[in-house]
Amino acid sequence: MLDPNLLRNELDAVAEKLARRGFTLDVEKIRQQEERRKVLQVETESLQAERNSRSKSIGAAKARGEDIEPLRQEVNQLGEKLEAAKAELDKLQADIRDYALTLPNLPHDSVPNGKDDSENVEVFRWGEPKTYDFELKDHVTLGELTDGLDFPSAVKITGSRFVVMKGQIARLHRAIAQFMLNLHTEQHGYQEMYVPYLVNHATLYGTGQLPKFSGDLFHTKPLEEESESQYALIPTAEVPVTNMVRDVILEEDELPLRMTAHTPCFRSEAGSYGRDTRGLIRMHQFDKVELVQIVHPEKSMDALEELTGHAEKVLQLLNLPYRKVVLCTGDMGFGARKTYDLEVWVPAQNTYREISSCSNCWDFQARRMQARFRAKGDKKTQLVHTLNGSGLAVGRTLVAIMENYQTADGRIEIPEVLRPYMNGLEYIG
């Protein structure tokens, strides 16, 4: 959520920055609402003061033996006007907030302008894609040869965009997640979290999935009216982990917080019809190891570089070629101020595919969550900055390993760093 003071005092500058994202801010609507809000604010304060004054007059008139009925009627009339003005002000403020909740974050000055992912900018490349002297197989074919990926059973059990993993492929999938968690907790300073996979709507508002992206979620009940019994499956562990600091005031010396969690993620993939229908690239349910940092505002840009580096380390230790791109304004997520994507080399597709997205959300989520900290010697509180990133998507890492480590006879070599998690196994198949 954007700072209301920016919308009041720097509206044209905000509109200009949002235009970089291809978002048209209704400037006239905001100006009219703000003018009306000021009028109603003055009116309610004036009516409240007048009503208080008249109420005091009743006691004085009564002490003098005067007829107080006219004064009492006047106080009642002022009370009715006050309630009406308050009701209008409350509704207007709710309308202002509802509109503010639909506004995306402002892009950082360092983010390149662009309309879509074709205008993202590559900033770094690591590793060289292997050359093969045999015909490459994709991960689906390799999964069939090793009897490790069973899509027909998943379709029977649930539907499309699900998978059943079996045997050593299932074990490799588990090993990947364990390796990532151990790396992030033992070397990168993250605290491992186990979190609910179902969250309430206040949590989804906090990290920005609601109200705008309800259609991307799996809800336990239709989203008609909010109640405590309505939940949604998490689209990413970012949602429950970041909300750990909702309505919390931290002390400055508690920052930064670094948290990681391995969870399944559930996404409806609305708008993705016909895209990546084969294999594990785009699923309704997939596993991810998430990285979250809660930091001092002055350190969030450095934290973005650090967090992205932690995700990159996974790829480097697995010896998987990748590239790092900074997303342009037209491709950034709703709550992000700046985002790096890591794209891993997928040989069968002869291209790089996203495997991690690392974002600095600035104070956008913190304002929604009222996540704050108190600086040393200061009574006032400030909003923290929040960051999140995939460290990494487990299923896509499995795809990359299967395809990059395939052999001519259809086996899959186990990356050396994963062999301790596989009881020393060197090959699958």
UniProtKB/Swiss-Prot annotation:
Q: Give one GO biological process term.
A: selenocysteine biosynthetic process
Region annotated Disordered sits at 45-65
Keyword Coiled coil attached: no
- Tell me which stretches of the chain form a coiled coil: none
Where in the cell?
Answer: Cytoplasm
Q: Which PANTHER family does this UniProt record tie to the protein?
A: SERINE--TRNA LIGASE, SERYL-TRNA SYNTHETASE
Q: What is the protein named?
A: Serine--tRNA ligase
Record organism: Proteus mirabilis (strain HI4320)
